[in-house]
Curated annotation (Swiss-Prot):
It is found in: Cell membrane. One of its GO terms (biological process) is transmembrane transport. It comes from Bacillus subtilis (strain 168). Residues 74-255 form the ABC transmembrane type-1 domain. The keyword Lipid biosynthesis does not apply. Pfam families: BPD_transp_1. This is Uncharacterized ABC transporter permease protein YtlD. InterPro entries: MetI-like (IPR000515), MetI-like_sf (IPR035906). Belongs to the binding-protein-dependent transport system permease family. It is a multi-pass membrane protein. Its main location: membrane. The chain crosses the membrane at residues 24-44, 85-105, 117-137, 140-160, 188-208, 209-229, 234-254. Part of a binding-protein-dependent transport system. Probably responsible for the translocation of the substrate across the membrane. Gene3D superfamilies: MetI-like.
Length: 270
């Protein structure tokens, strides 16, 4: 019995070692790709293999970053865009989930709205930007609305599908004990669909950034989207690349935050 336990412990240690080794390899390759990309970009710019005026260089972007941080202008742009994106992200996810719950509650409503959801999902949401600006005015409200609307429909479709795919046996058991529909939704449907909702959050991170940046392209006088447009207008592509890199960093941080939420939720269920 003791030998059996020691064998299991040894196998578990070997498994953990392999997992750590694999994780280290993945991180090493990720770091190597990162270094190669920026090194290649810098060398190509210095050697004239690419036009430094158009493609800039990491060193030029870094110098501009320090300059913008020094005068304090960059933080205000980041703050505005981050506020709009997070709010649009939360609103889009919340409204999409609520609409999905409404469709689950009423099969008739789901059948009525189904073709319209398909059509709206096929439409390029970015094209709604000018309409939102006219309807809501050229303000941060229209930008937040853009960040929310771009993710509402896909959230509704994905979450509603997850609601529909919950095992009917669970709901039948609840009905047998006389549970009301809202109790079934709260105790069975919503918890069982949590993985799909969290997966939707991951998708919505990118969609919200797209919606907000496009909104800032159209109306804003502040924000990272405005910095990109201004950079194009004055032919300052270093400013454009700086803005894009900042967007990439914060989008990654938001995505990592959702992944952390997913891990905590998974750990809480086990």
């Amino acid at each position: 019995m003791r030998n059996s336990k020691e064998t299991i412990d040894l196998l578990h240690e070997q498994y953990q070692f392999k997992q750590k080794k694999e994780k280290w390899k993945v991180h090493s390759f990720q770091l190597a790709i990162f270094i190669l990309f920026f090194s290649g970009w810098e060398i190509s710019s210095r050697q004239g293999w690419i036009d430094p005026l158009i493609f800039s260089s990491p060193s030029a972007v870094w110098r501009l970053l320090l300059e913008k941080l020094g005068d304090g202008s960059l933080l205000s742009h980041i703050g505005v865009t981050l506020f709009e994106t997070v709010l649009g992200f939360l609103l889009g996810t919340f409204m999409g989930t609520c609409l999905a719950a409404l469709l689950w509650w009423s099969n008739r409503l789901a059948r009525i709205l189904d073709p319209y959801l398909v059509i709206l999902n096929a439409m390029p949401k970015v094209a709604l930007g000018p309409i939102l600006i006219v309807a809501l005015g050229p303000s941060f409200i229209s930008i937040i609305a853009m960040g929310a609307i771009i993710s509402v429909i896909i959230t509704t479709i994905v979450v509603y599908t997850a609601f529909q795919e919950v095992d009917e046996n669970y709901t039948k058991v609840m009905k047998t004990f006389g549970a009301k529909k809202w109790v079934i939704f709260k105790e069975v449907i919503l918890p069982a669909s949590s993985p799909a909702i969290i997966s939707t959050l991951k998708v919505n991170v990118g969609l919200s950034w797209v919606g907000v940046i496009v909104g800032e392209f159209l109306v804003s006088k502040v924000g990272l989207g405005y910095m990109i447009i201004y950079g194009f207008q004055v032919f300052n592509f270093t400013l454009v690349f700086l803005s894009l890199l900042i967007i990439a960093i914060f989008a990654t941080l938001m995505y990592q935050g959702v992944e952390l939420l997913e891990k905590k939720w998974t750990k809480g269920r086990t």
